[in-house]
A protein has these predicted regions:
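Charged, compositionally biased N-terminal leader segments and the immediate start
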Residues: 1-31
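N-terminal low-complexity segments that are often proline-rich with Ser/Thr-Pro
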Residues: 434-438
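NTP-dependent nucleotidyl-transfer catalytic core
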Residues: 16, 26-47, 52, 59-433
């Protein structure tokens, strides 16, 4: 039972009496909106149906709306109906409609809202995917809740859903994380001269990781080579941070199905494989990028790079996939990652990103189209920023400065249910006062 679908049927019945069926057939009914009015005091349902039909049939929308209202007024389920503005129709339903709906919901129990819409279809939803360089902070909670809510809705409609977290463990930031942990390790072992350099991670959470290493291994790493200890501290730091991430997600009632590693993808030849596909399709070339629009930087140097012809697939400019030093860009490994999803049988993909990644959407969608020969689709949902206020002033959350409010802090203060309730509306900015949380 769906009240808004029932109203649509009522509207079509009214139109059959006002207009002939041939005229109705000319209209794209997807343009018709049947939804709650902005002001609930006006009624239960608002629709633009008269305006859509009038525009296509060269009829005055308000005149058509009045005719429809006259027909709807005879319906037993309609308590009142009126025309607003240029031709909007506002409908108030009789109480019995809502009583029947509530009765249907109670009888349906957990099955209410279920459908077979996605039966036989697989879909991959990737969300959160924060760098493993610190605990999840309050801003990550929004993408986490939006992604989880969407996954649950899709499962409710019959889709086979894979909830995935991409671990960005291949970049320089995880090397810096390992170095930062080693500095804390030296500090715990009695080196009073330790100073955390700029650009490293000063957060106290690394002291806990370093303390665990001391408890497990003692001071053995002080005598090991830089290469050996760097690799060990990087691996252990990422491992411990991901355990913390999983615990934070669980505290929100979120369990991922898969955690995929960027480093493992690169080491297994994933990037080389996907770029060979682009090479075969003649979609790579050596070129020079123009300076970023709207930015004047004295440090900008025009240099030849390996570029992907993303403009052929709707992007604004072609994109670099390999740097002049031969290393891959983040974009290259992201292409490989999405191609890996495709190889695992996911032809429909959804990514939940923060607002700061909005400019990355076109290039990623163009890459997915290119490497899957348009067989797969990528839909990106953007979550707007979560602002934290301290003493009425915005706080810029940064792991490298150590200044952020963690998900653990927020869950402890208000509980997971409150967070899950306020976070899902992803398209508006959200402001949280830290005084009430920490």
């Amino acid at each position: 039972m769906n009240i808004y679908q029932d109203v649509e049927h009522m509207l079509m019945e009214a139109f059959n009496k006002v207009l002939c069926p041939k005229e109705i057939g000319k209209i794209d009914q997807n343009l018709i909106n049947v939804e709650p009015p902005r002001d609930k005091e006006h009624g239960d349902v608002a629709t633009n149906v008269a305006m859509v039909f009038a525009n296509k049939l060269s009829i005055k929308s308000r005149d058509l709306a009045i005719k429809i209202c006259n027909e709807l007024d005879r319906n037993d389920y309609v308590s009142a109906v009126k025309v607003a503005g240029p031709g909007f129709i506002i409908i108030k339903l009789v109480d019995e409609v809502w009583f029947e709906s509530l009765e249907f919901i109670l009888k349906s129990g957990k099955d209410y809202g279920s459908s077979a819409l996605g039966t036989g279809k697989k879909i991959n939803i990737e969300y959160v995917s924060a760098n493993p360089t610190g605990p999840l902070h309050a801003a990550h909670a929004r993408g986490a809740v939006v992604g989880d809510a969407l996954a649950r809705l899709l499962m409710k409609t019959g889709y086979e859903v894979c909830k995935e977290y991409y671990i960005n463990d291949a970049g320089s930031q995880v090397d810096i994380l390992g170095k930062s942990t080693f500095l804390r390790y030296q500090e715990i072992l009695g080196d009073d001269s330790i100073v955390i350099p700029d650009g490293h991670y000063p957060g106290a959470y690394l002291k806990d990781i370093a303390a665990e290493i001391v408890e497990k291994d003692g001071n053995k790493w002080l005598s090991r080579s830089v290469e050996e200890r760097s690799d060990a501290f990087r691996k252990y730091s990422v491992q411990m941070m991901m355990e913390k991430v999983k615990a934070d997600l669980n505290s929100l009632g979120i369990e991922m199905d898969i955690f995929s590693s960027e480093r493992s993808l690169i080491q297994s030849g994933g990037v080389d494989s996907v770029l060979s596909i682009l090479e075969e399709r003649e979609l790579l070339y050596e070129g020079v990028l123009d300076p970023p629009k709207g930015k004047q930087s004295e440090n900008w140097i025009s240099r030849p790079q390996r570029l992907f012809k993303s403009t052929l697939f709707g992007d604004d400019v072609d994109r670099a996939i390999q740097k002049t030093d031969g290393s891959w860009t983040y974009f290259a490994s992201d292409i490989a990652y999405h191609y890996d999803k495709y190889k695992r049988g996911f032809y429909e993909m959804i990514d939940i990103w923060g607002a700061d990644h909005g400019g990355y959407v076109k290039r990623m969608q163009s890459a997915v189209n290119a490497v899957t020969f348009d067989e797969a689709t990528l839909d990106v949902k953007i979550c707007q920023i979560v602002h934290m206020l301290k003493d009425g002033k915005p706080v810029r959350m940064s792991k490298r400065s150590g200044d952020f409010v963690t998900i653990e802090d927020v869950v402890t203060a208000v509980g997971k249910d409150v967070i899950r309730f306020i976070m899902p509306v992803s398209y508006t900015h959200l402001t949280l006062p830290t005084k009430r949380i920490v």
